[in-house]
Regions:
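Short Fe-S-cluster ligation motifs
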Residues: 25-48
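Auxiliary Fe-S-binding modules of radical SAM enzymes
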Residues: 188-313
Length: 313
C-alpha cells in the first residue's frame, strides 16, 4: 500500500457498493438532476478502479451502462500500471469517457520512497495509450510527498504539461493516521509542507496549467469530518484552492506594479468581474496587505480578460 494511503478515512467510506446500490444511486441522481444530467458524469473514485476484482468491476460497469444515455459520460480513476489495451477495450465497450491516472509524482525516487509500485515511465506509456483510444485523460499529482521537494513537484507539473492531459487534480499531501507516512512523521523522518508553503507552490501550478490550457478540476482534498479527525498536522484547509487563487492575484499585482516608477501612479486594478473575490482575498486580505504597502486603488472590470488576468493603470 502507498505510504500516504488510507482511502476509508479520506473518503469516509468503509464499504464497497453493490451493483444494485449503484443503480439506485444513479436512478435517484437522474431523477433529482432532471435535465442537468446532461452536464453530469457517472464517476467511480476512491481507489484504483481497473485494479479491483474483474468480475466486480464489470458488474459496476454493467450498472452504470444502463444509465449512460442519461449522463454526459462515465469517469474512472485508476493506477497507471493497471492500464493496457485489454482494459481500455473493456472500458470503451461500456461507455467510459474519461480516465484519470493517479500519477502523484514524475520522480522515480519519490514514487519508490512512497511505495507507489509504478514508475514515471508507466505514466507516460499509459497516458499515450489512453489518448490513442480517444478517452479524455486526467492526471493527478500530490505535492509535498515524502522525499519530494518544491523542485520535484514543479518537475512533475511541467512533465504533466508535456503529456498534455485534458484535466489535472492537485492534492497537497495530508498525513492520514495508520499509514507509513504517519509513522515517518511521528518518528521525525518526514516534515510536511506548511500551509503557506503549499499555497505558494500551488498558486504557481495554477498559473502553469492555466497557461497551457489544462483544466484544474480539483485543488485540495474534499472536506470531511473523517479526514479532519484522522489526520496529523495543520496544513489542511477546506478552502485551499481559494487561498491559492488569492495568492496568485496578489503576486500578479506585485509583479505588475514593478512597471510603475511610483506606487501612487497605480489608480485602478482591472480584472474579470467573476474574479473579484479571488482578487480581494478572504476577508479582503489581499486589499489589506496591499494597502499596508501603500497602494490605494479602485477595482474595475473587463470581462474580456481571462480568469486570472489583471492589469494596472
Amino acid at each position: 500500500m502507498c505510504s500516504f494511503c488510507n482511502q476509508n478515512k479520506i473518503t469516509g467510506q468503509i464499504y464497497q457498493p453493490t451493483p444494485l446500490e449503484v443503480e439506485r444511486i444513479l436512478d435517484k441522481a437522474a431523477s433529482d438532476l432532471g435535465e442537468r444530467t446532461k452536464n453530469a458524469e457517472i464517476a467511480f473514485f476512491g481507489g484504483s478502479f481497473t485494479a479491483i476484482d474483474r468480475t466486480y468491476m464489470l458488474s459496476l460497469l454493467d450498472a452504470a451502462k444502463k444509465f449512460r444515455d442519461k449522463f454526459c459520460g462515465i469517469r474512472i480513476s485508476t493506477r497507471p500500471d493497471y492500464i493496457d489495451k485489454e482494459i481500455l477495450d473493456i472500458l470503451k465497450s461500456y461507455g467510459v469517457t474519461s480516465i484519470e491516472l493517479g500519477a502523484q509524482s514524475m520522480s522515480d525516487d519519490v514514487l519508490l520512497a512512497n511505495d507507489r509500485g509504478h514508475s514515471a515511465e508507466s505514466v507516460f506509456k499509459s497516458s499515450q495509450l489512453i489518448k490513442s483510444y480517444g478517452f479524455s485523460l486526467g492526471l493527478q499529482m500530490m505535492t509535498g510527498l515524502y522525499k519530494s521537494d518544491i523542485q520535484k513537484d514543479l518537475y512533475t507539473a511541467e512533465t504533466f504539461v508535456k503529456i498534455n492531459p485534458d484535466t489535472v487534480r492537485i492534492y497537497p499531501t495530508v498525513i492520514m493516521k495508520d499509514t507509513k507516512l504517519a509513522e515517518l512523521y511521528l518518528n521525525g523522518e518526514y516534515t510536511p509542507y506548511s500551509l503557506e508553503k503549499s499555497v505558494n507552490l500551488c498558486s504557481r501550478l495554477i498559473e502553469l496549467f492555466e497557461k497551457n490550457n489544462i483544466k484544474i478540476i480539483r485543488l485540495g482534498l474534499h472536506y470531511s469530518d473523517s479526514l479532519v479527525n484522522n489526520s496529523y498536522g495543520d496544513n489542511y484547509h477546506p478552502a485551499f484552492k481559494e487561498l491559492c487563487e488569492n495568492k496568485l492575484f496578489y503576486d500578479k499585482f506585485i509583479e505588475k506594479a514593478k512597471d510603475f516608477l511610483d506606487l501612487n501612479e497605480i489608480k485602478t486594478v482591472v480584472i474579470n468581474s467573476k474574479s473579484l473575490s479571488k482578487f480581494l482575498g478572504q476577508k479582503r486580505s489581499n486589499v489589506k496587505k496591499l494597502n499596508e504597502l501603500g497602494y490605494d486603488f479602485s477595482v474595475c472590470f473587463d470581462d474580456t480578460l481571462q480568469k486570472y488576468e489583471l492589469y494596472l493603470k
